[in-house]
Amino acid sequence: MSSTEVPGEVSTSVSSYFDTILILDFGSQYSHLIARRLREIHVYAELLPCTQKIEALPFKPIGVILSGGPYSVYDDIAPHVDPAVFELGVPVLGICYGMQEIAWLNGRCVEPGIEREYGPATVSMEPEIKTEVFKSFFNSMPKEFEVWMSHGDRLSALPNGYETIGRTKNSPFAVIAHVTKPIIGLQFHPEVTHTPLGLQLIKNFAIEICHAKPNWSMENFVDKEILRIRKMIGPSDHVIGAVSGGVDSTVASKVLKEAIGDRFHAIMVDNGLLRLNEAEIVRETLNKHLGIQLTVVDASEEFIGKLKGVTDPEKKRKIIGNTFIHVFEREAERIVKETNGKVEYLLQGTLYPDVIESISFKGPSQTIKTHHNVGGLLKDMKLKLIEPLRELFKDEVRALGELLGIEHSLVWRHPFPGPGLGIRILGEVNAAQLEIARKADHIFITEIRNHGYYDKISQAFAALLPVKAVGVMGDKRTHEQVIALRAITTSDFMTADWYDGFSIKFLKLVSSRICNEVSGVNRVLYDISSKPPATVEME
């Protein structure tokens, strides 16, 4: 059953309104895909670190999935799940490391494999399955099916109280299940596309075994979210909204506008790190298409002054985040005086991938970098954050934007990071570097639009590298800076591929324009790194 709200309190979790499957993350690169697959079948899922204490959960899940991970369960430093997971009385599905965790906790029957197993394999069903409940798990599945393996350890024996449901050539315990309890383990990864019928298995677990109601949709989400915001804000308080013009802040602003009307104040901080003519474009866009009056606060000198001499990426993000909050607090005080109201909340367009990337715990996962929407904020911040998109993936945000009637060109606009050009200039940020990065980026994006590539790409930008290269212009030797172009395609920004659709003619044109029109640049590179191992942004 779904979690219920405590009378008199305002729920801050989407899980209060939808049947929720909890995913405990052991550090697998595929963990986020589990959540995505569940949401594709309209079942809500939340991902939390494997160290999550069950007694501290703000909701009761209707099922739990233990993800894969890079460690061996028998290592001293291996992470382990809170045993209380198995006392919740809900179905549990262990995937790869998650399955080995189940086996380790029930007999220590995990050992190094004779051979590592990476790649495709064929699972064969056992002819007789004693565990009646798990016949549902293989509903609509053939007796043999292809799966994707990615493991170095194996089960040395069946855990106490379990039986074998499926096996592969190299894995005699590829699928196991408890004889009496709704606990199942898979040695393979059903969440990846390389397991063609994996989505059916996930659906069977969620719908047939956990009995989840498949009612997760943007239509159901937005009405509940607007009501939640109204309860949280009350009848007289005001909210200031951090607006950048990107799809995230635009959709978030529209949600707030729908919830509290003119008590929402959209504010854009011109931190001096914006794209060319960005403030003017965003002001016109919000006024014309959304009916939202935008206040632009020019704090460029304040930001750039504090970034002087700073080259470390994390320090830059922290400085930008802290300064951002200070500026907003000042603006909130102004609005309080003008409206005789009360400003307690700051809107941010934080998305679920932002949250996942920023999770750090004592286990295999490492914080890759402080995300600009959830990190870099002062611990003593006076404003409370309100993040209506916090539980959504990017494709869900776009679907929500279209549902709210936002114009297609706005919904599908490429993202722009909160720290702006500050993290696209590798090294120290100053006026001269900003001029170079801004002009190069403008040329790149303009040509992408002109040549019909824009809607085929998820994000593109030009970055200024902290190196100089020797070149020749006319008959003179030059020693100038280097621009790196980056364009990626992705469905959720958790993983991404570099875009390979540009023609050589197009790249030649962009390179020529940048070298000729941007003073101080004599070399242009194209970044062909995917995520992972790279991140989308360079800092």
UniProtKB/Swiss-Prot annotation:
Q: Which Gene3D superfamilies match?
A: 3.30.300.10, 3.40.50.880, HUPs
Q: Which SUPFAM superfamilies match?
A: Adenine nucleotide alpha hydrolases-like, Class I glutamine amidotransferase-like, GMP synthetase C-terminal dimerisation domain
Please state the Enzyme Commission number of this protein: 6.3.5.2
**Per the entry, which co-factors are needed?**
Mg(2+)
Residues forming the catalytic site: C96, H189, E191
**Residues of the GMPS ATP-PPase domain:** 216-413
Q: Which UniProt keywords apply?
A: ATP-binding, Cytoplasm, Glutamine amidotransferase, GMP biosynthesis, Ligase, Magnesium, Nucleotide-binding, Purine biosynthesis
Query: Which GO biological process annotations does it have?
Result: GMP biosynthetic process
- Its domain of life? Eukaryota
Location in the cell reads: Cytoplasm, Cytosol
Q: Where is the Glutamine amidotransferase type-1 domain?
A: 20-215
Provide the reaction this enzyme catalyses. XMP + L-glutamine + ATP + H2O = GMP + L-glutamate + AMP + diphosphate + 2 H(+)
GO CC annotation: cytosol
Question: What pathway or pathways are given for this protein in its record?
Answer: Purine metabolism; GMP biosynthesis; GMP from XMP (L-Gln route): step 1/1
What PROSITE patterns does the record tag this protein with?
GATASE_TYPE_1, GMPS_ATP_PPASE
Q: Does the keyword Cell membrane apply?
A: no
Q: Name one GO molecular function term.
A: ATP binding
InterPro entries per the UniProt record, alphabetical: Class_I_gatase-like, GATASE, GMP_synth_C, GMP_synth_GATase, GMP_synthase, GMPS_ATP_PPase_dom, Rossmann-like_a/b/a_fold
Where does the chain bind XMP? R317, D475, K531, E537
* Annotated binding of ATP, by residue: S244, G245, G246, V247, D248, S249, T250
Q: What class of enzyme is it?
A: ligase
**What PANTHER family does the annotation carry?**
GMP SYNTHASE [GLUTAMINE-HYDROLYZING] (PTHR11922:SF2), GMP SYNTHASE-RELATED (PTHR11922)
Assembly and partners are described as: Homodimer.
Give the function comment from the record: Catalyzes the conversion of xanthine monophosphate (XMP) to GMP in the presence of glutamine and ATP through an adenyl-XMP intermediate.
- UniProt xrefs under NCBIfam families: guaA_Cterm, guaA_Nterm, PRK00074.1
Q: What is this protein called?
A: GMP synthase [glutamine-hydrolyzing]
